Each structure stands twice: as C-alpha cells, then as structure tokens.
Amino acid sequence: MTDLSDSSKLVYKAKHKIRFVTAASLFDGHDASINIMRRILQASGAEVIHLGHNRSVDEVVSAVLQEDAQGVAVSSYQGGHIEYFKYLIDLLRSPKNEAAGARVQVFGGGGGVVVASEVKELQDYGVARIYSPEDGQRMGLQGMINDMLARCDFDPAVKEPKTLAQTITALELGILDPKTIKPKSAPVLGVTGTGGAGKSSLTDELVRRFRLDQGDALKIAILSVDPTRRKTGGALLGDRIRMNAIHGDGVFMRSLATREGGSGLSGAIGGAVAAW
C-alpha cells in the first residue's frame, strides 16, 4: 500500500510559473499513470501541455521547445526506455537546441519495467529522475509531484530572448512590452467556441490543407488558449493532443493559459501575434 505521510500530502508552493509537457512514449498505449501525474501536476499549480500516448522523441522535444517548458514527464512501459530517454536527452542538449533545451528537467517512470541499474544509468546520463515503484511507496504521488515541481521551480525567462518561444514567455511574464514588437503583416484567423466544439480538430484540418495546397511554402503559427483554474493556478493545455499536421519546420504552436480569472484570452496574445 502506498505510504502517504503528512509531508507527502502538502502541495509544493512554487515561486515561479511552471510549465510541463507530459506524454507516454512511442509504441506505448499505457497512459493511465501519466494521466494521473498530469492531473496532480495541474492541481498543484502547473501548466500542463499534455500530448497523450504513442509520442516520439521528436514530437516531445518539439513541444518542449515551442512551449518553453521547464520540465517534461514521460511514462514508458514498452521496454525501450533506455534508448528513448537517452535520445530525448541527446536532442535537448544538442548544439541546435542547447540554448533552450539545456535547462529542461526530464522525468520518467515505468513501474517495474525499469530496473534499478537502468534507473542509475539514465540518471547518470542526464535524466533528472526516474521514479520507481519504491519511490511511489516512500514518497506518495503528491511527494513525487512535489519533487518534480521543486526541481523545475526556476525563472523561465532569459535576459535576451533568442527564439519566438522565449519571446512569448517574456510577454506572459510581463517583462517584455508588446509595444516594442513591430507587428508583422501575416493574416490572422481566430477560432472560438465552447469546450468540445471541435476547435482543435478544425484548426488541424486547416493547417493540413494549407500545407498540402501550398507545398509547405507557408510558415504557420498556432496560438492556443485555455483557462487557468482560479483555485490552483494550474491549467490543462491539451490542444496539441488533437494536432496531427503540425509536425514540420514550417509550423509553430504555443499553448497559453489565461492566467487571469474571468478572461477568455491570455494577456500575452496580442504581443505573441505581433511577434510572429
């Protein structure tokens, strides 16, 4: 039975806004555990970009960099965890991505599939933490989430934003004045509707047709906004899970939380549109 001590029930209070990407690894349909973890992350105040199951390293890294997340959590029960997590670290730390990816904390779990010697091997390689069944018994679910949040509780902003993702982060944090950004002339289309109306599916279909019709000649940006929970400050940013046509150099996607109760848009949306 899981030992939930008093300390493990206390929710970590972060000093900064923390963003996490969560997913189950490639060829892996076991998403029950990662769904539990992303729900607790959200309930603990994190903004969670959930990708769902069967996600490649390329897809995960692309999401982490475009979303400018501090952490990524992946569950892997399909037996290929050594190769998967090492490749994930390699891509994040590659010269191409080093400016944004070097700081990203990588977390994983796979129950009894990942044995103790492999846990050590992966953590020695650069994974921040692989949580074992013994960790779950000792720390409890909230205890593991608290550990993840504490390791990712650092200022996500950089002094001189070099990427679009970093620019949007600076806009969200209010340290960059949107008036200093010269608006581009790209046409802007807004899609709105109630939850479950099909906004993400429609957007994905539009992107797919633009790419097919124009032969990937266009550069396309998608800015997706979801509400922040007033009580916890967390948010589930789940539109990426419906996007199948965004994978490629010409498409950028960023998920934003409203961060303000009662608002339907993020305060950074105007600056983000101008920055593109």
Where are these regions (language model features)?
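Non-catalytic signal-transmission and effector/linker regions of two-component phosphorelay proteins
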Residues: 1-18
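Extreme N-terminal, non-catalytic leader segments
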Residues: 3-7, 141-188
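Gly-rich Lys/Arg/Thr-decorated short loops/hinges at beta-loop-alpha junctions or inter-strand turns
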Residues: 14-21, 35-46, 67-71, 101, ...
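Residues at the beta-strand->loop junction immediately N-terminal to the Walker
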Residues: 23, 192-195
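Cofactor-cradling patches in redox/metallo enzymes
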Residues: 27, 34-143
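ATP-binding Walker
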Residues: 28, 194-197
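Conserved phosphate-handling catalytic cores of large alpha/beta enzymes
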Residues: 116, 123-165, 259-261, 265-266, ...
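Nucleotide-state-sensitive switch-loop elements of NTP-binding domains
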Residues: 172-186, 197, 202, 206-276
